């Protein structure tokens, strides 16, 4: 009896995606229970970054980056897919634990009335603000996961000898990170902390072997 190659690919790696069930329940529980954060995240640089509602589109493109990179690595480079899941899911878990121990939030979001503009981007921003409270922000999971996806993809077989794809992956991820501060979804502090959680994995998973070994 011949084994089905698709079924073989499904086991066990796709089961890692069950983590999203745990993550979403945990995240939204925190979103509902943390009403008055103990720590307000703010940096002087935040006041110099203007609000631009049009960055909501690269902000929302995170979902496409997530789906695309996850599917491509799962199908074509299982080893890189495993590294992505390890980096991204462990980082998300760390963030959620930190949100519980050190409840934090933002005070930099403007109101629609203060902005005084009415366009499709502003309407999307208002829906986003209504759905996503300005709590549980540091480190930024949006930035942490974007960095993990760019790192895993750029070091995968798919991007090997394809510098254009590496630039595209990192450019997209950094645009998403920039969008978080231009839409006032995050402080620059959240972004730096989120990317720091990506950087710690580089020497662990992508350290070059020493010569002669």
Predicted features along the sequence, with ranges:
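Membrane-embedded catalytic cores of phosphoryl/pyrophosphoryl-handling enzymes
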Residues: 125-213
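Aromatic-anchored segments of alpha-helical transmembrane domains
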Residues: 24-29, 92-101, 171-181
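Alpha-helical transmembrane segments of integral membrane proteins
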Residues: 11-19, 82-90, 164-169, 189
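Hydrophobic alpha-helical transmembrane segments
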Residues: 56-72, 89, 93, 145
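Hydrophobic faces of alpha-helical transmembrane segments in multi-pass integral membrane proteins
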Residues: 18, 22, 26, 86, ...
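N-terminal transmembrane-helix/juxtamembrane module of multi-pass inner/ER membrane proteins
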Residues: 1-66, 116-118, 125
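Non-cytosolic membrane-interface motifs at loop->transmembrane helix junctions
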Residues: 43-46, 114-115, 189-195
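Membrane-interface loops
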Residues: 31-44, 74-164
């Amino acid at each position: 009896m011949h084994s089905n190659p698709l079924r073989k690919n499904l086991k066990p790696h796709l089961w890692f995606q069950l983590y999203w069930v745990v993550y979403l329940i945990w995240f939204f529980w925190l979103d509902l229970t943390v009403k008055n954060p103990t720590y307000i995240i703010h940096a002087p640089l935040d006041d110099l970054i203007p609000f631009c509602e049009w960055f909501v589109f690269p902000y929302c493109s995170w979902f496409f980056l997530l789906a695309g990179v996850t599917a491509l690595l799962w199908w074509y480079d299982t080893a890189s897919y495993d590294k992505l899941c390890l980096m991204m899911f462990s980082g998300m878990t760390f963030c959620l634990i930190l949100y519980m121990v050190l409840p934090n939030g933002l005070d930099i979001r403007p109101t629609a009335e203060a902005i005084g503009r009415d366009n499709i981007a502003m309407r999307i921003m208002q829906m986003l603000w209504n759905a996503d409270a300005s709590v549980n922000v540091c480190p930024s999971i949006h930035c942490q996961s974007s960095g993990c996806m760019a790192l895993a993809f750029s070091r995968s077989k798919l991007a090997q000898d394809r510098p254009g794809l590496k630039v595209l992956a990192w450019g997209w991820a950094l645009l998403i990170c920039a969008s978080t501060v231009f839409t006032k979804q995050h402080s620059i502090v959240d972004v730096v902390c989120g990317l720091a959680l990506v950087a710690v994995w580089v020497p662990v998973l992508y350290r070059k072997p020493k010569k002669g070994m």
